[in-house]
Structures are given as C-alpha cells and as structure tokens.
Amino acid sequence: MLFIALIKFKKKARDAAEYGKSILENLPKGIKIIGTYWTLGRYDAVWVYEAPSEKEAIKLGIDAGEVMQTQTLVAISREEAIKLLGKI
C-alpha cells in the first residue's frame, strides 16, 4: 500500500531533521521510503512510503509524533483509480 504523510514540525527544523533521520534509519518492519521532501506552505515536509498495511503505517506516525505532527493519506495510482471507475 502507498501512503503520503504530510508533516508539520513541532520543534525547530534542525531538531526535526535530526530526529527524522533517526526514524528513517530505523523504520518499522515492512516500510519502504520512496521519497522525503521538504516543502513550502502549510506543511514542512512530505514522506511518500510503502507499508504492508494501515497498521504498519500508523507505527511510523507514532514514532514521528514526538517532533512532528503527521496527516497520513492512503494513495492509489491514477491507473488504479480509473480501473475502479470502470467497475462502477
């Protein structure tokens, strides 16, 4: 499953970066990071990652919770969405 985490830092960016590095180096089992991006606007960063289930994805958000507030979205590809539309 594909997930997108929208992140707001709770602490200074430098502290969040150091803590985030630690999290990304010690990921929960089965999680694969596809990309991490710092952003301008409402959110400070975005993580795109794969996890075997929502339960495993939640673990990453819990681990990050000390220094980051996350809003996690489940994502599917455009192609998958179009296939689903065809089944309606």
Where are these regions (language model features)?
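An amphipathic, aromatic/His-enriched active-site/gating alpha helix that lines ligand/cofactor pockets
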Residues: I31, P52-E80
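Short beta-strand element of the conserved SAM-dependent methyltransferase core
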Residues: A5-I7, Y49, T72
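General N-terminal targeting signals
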Residues: G20-L24, V48-E50, I62, E66, ...
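Short S/T/G/P-rich N-terminal loop/turn motif that feeds into the first structured element of a domain
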Residues: M1-L27, T39-Y43, K55, I76-I88
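A generic structural signal for short beta-strands and their flanking turns/coil linkers
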Residues: K29, G41-A45, E66-M68
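Alpha-helical interaction segments
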Residues: L27-P28, I33
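Short, intrinsically disordered low-complexity segments
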Residues: I34-L60
